[in-house]
Amino acid sequence: MRRTVTAALAALVALAVITPAAAVDYYSGPLIDAHGHLPNATAIDTYVAAMRRHNIRKVMLLGVGPVQPQEAEWIDAALKKYPDLVAAGVRVPDPTNMAAAGQLDVELARTKARVMGEVHIRQTGSKIERDPSGPAFMRILELSAQRGVPVVIHDELTPAAAASLEAALAAYRQATIVLAHAGESTPATLERLLARNANLMIDLSGMHFQRKPSLAKEKGPLDRGWKALITKMPDRFMVGLDLWVARLFEPAMLDRLMTWTRRVLGELPPDVAEQIAWKNAATLYHLD
């Protein structure tokens, strides 16, 4: 009996050695990076080269506000140099200023941009704490509703922050808010918000293996909770890399991040992956 068991175990070990690991199905279709930034004037060249290597059709460049006074020039130059690959949002002035909406209206008329942002509502690292249901931001949402132009916000959700966000969403149902980085929240919290607010979209930007919380480690599987929610509500999510610091624009790192993105998308049902990868962004931002 012992000899039989030993032989069986040896056979299993041999089979494990010669049987290849299950192949990972990478998503191979088009991609739109729905949330990008520039750290300097030249990073766009490295990024576009990586886009071409990885079949990324478009990147939506967003502003980060007063911390980069020159970014408007960098973004304008990128648009002119790569008009087929780069789209851009309108930078939002101080969202607590009652004049901000009027300034945005002028810029939207001038640029024909299809998104406003990124607006920092709650960012603990920079000690930013703003109320999205406050009067100045309400004017911005009114403009969003009138022009049909979504606004991207950075809002690190707590129960109180989520309540304020929901009040803003309820005030202008025709305005679309895109919650960047999934609000650094949980699938359970977002599922409730999404179910109650049809005018809320989620971009999954910056949730790669270089940051926390991440959708997946560099070689690990897609988190089960995120996979379940994305599959359940595939029309509410978009991918984005949210690259900003210069070290992330190094070619080798870009290759790793873009490969990771395709691997994670490959874990979703093909029709869901296609929506998250590019269809939702193309529809929301009117991208070709």
Predicted regions: what is each one?
Residues 2, 22-30, 35, 45-49, ...:
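Mid-to-C-terminal alpha-helical segments outside catalytic/metal-binding sites
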Residues 7-17:
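Bacterial N-terminal signal peptides
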Residues 10-11, 21, 221:
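Cleavable N-terminal signal peptides
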Residues 24, 66, 72-151, 206-209, ...:
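Active-site gating/metal-coordination segments in enzymes
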Residues 35, 51, 59, 88, ...:
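Divalent metal-coordination and catalytic microenvironments
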Residues 36-44, 63-71, 93-100, 124-131, ...:
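Acidic-and-aromatic substrate-binding clefts and catalytic sites of carbohydrate-active enzymes
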Residues 46-50, 71-78, 103-107, 136-140, ...:
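A general structural detector for well-ordered alpha-helical segments in enzyme core domains, enriched
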Residues 83-86, 90, 130-239:
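Catalytic pocket-lining loop regions of alpha/beta-barrel enzymes
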